[in-house]
């Protein structure tokens, strides 16, 4: 694909000097001599009449405002050139926009939605393993099934494999789609083989890690000799182990804080946790000195009740006198009763009780 930038040059009075220097200008489109005042020049040295420079597909006139593409001696506008010669999706055979994200498998380019297994139509995501066979994608499961059928010598199902050879490409990882505004080719890299450690190797690495989580270069060399692993595998194992332990310690710390918060918080209230003891028998005996309680009735209350009575009988009056004598402070006698009765009003019904502070 050749990208050519369209430029227009205005010759004016310098046209004679240019003709003297470079000769007569000939149109690439029609082959005739250009006598026009303006010449459309396509880099690097192609010159055209203004009426001859147009798209070979849609006949759109090309000038300095658009991009011109030249292929096999024909000129194309950008739209037709991309449609005819641009990179297309290997699955749907549709071109790409400048803002599309693509997935690559060797020399093939796919839309994000078109990057699927050709057998089960499972969408392949970045990180999934796949194989590319006869320009068709296979997920890891279908790749393994095909390998089993090939090793067993059984005939391949025509619904799954259509005229394919038994050679299958090695599975490679899906790479992240490039965040670029244009599509271009990149060399693909296969994934590294996953290393599986046996029990003896794991025991050796864990023992060394418990003694020193960050071994020096000498210790790593000794581990290489003891385990038979590569230095890169040992370095990555220690890095992953330290990362896992750090995450585990952070998680345990958060769990302890949450557990402590749950114990001390009850319905949003913070308090001190209490522990209930064993039940004990209730003792009715009261510790302390006995207290004698006596009932005291103020004298005015008895007098008020006496005054409100309409009929006075002798026994009730004698009881009132006896109560008054018992409520006195030791100074009561027969004369006191006479003085108390003399202080009563003539009309008992006119007596009204008033509260007295005791």
Curated annotation (Swiss-Prot):
SMART domains the UniProt entry points to: HOX, LIM
GO molecular function: cis-regulatory region sequence-specific DNA binding; DNA-binding transcription factor activity, RNA polymerase II-specific; metal ion binding
Location in or out of the cell: Nucleus
One term under GO cellular component: nucleus
Example of a GO biological process term: axonogenesis
Start and end residues of each LIM zinc-binding domain: 27-80, 89-143
Biased composition (Polar residues): 336-358
Assigned keywords, A-Z: Developmental protein, DNA-binding, Homeobox, LIM domain, Metal-binding, Nucleus, Repeat, Zinc
Record-annotated DNA-binding residue ranges: 190-249
Residue segments, region Disordered: 325-358
Composition-biased stretches (Low complexity): 325-335
Function: Binds to one of the cis-acting domain of the insulin gene enhancer. May be involved in subtype specialization of primary motoneurons.
Protein name, as recorded: Insulin gene enhancer protein ISL-2A
Lineage: Eukaryota, Metazoa, Chordata, Craniata, Vertebrata
Gene: isl2a
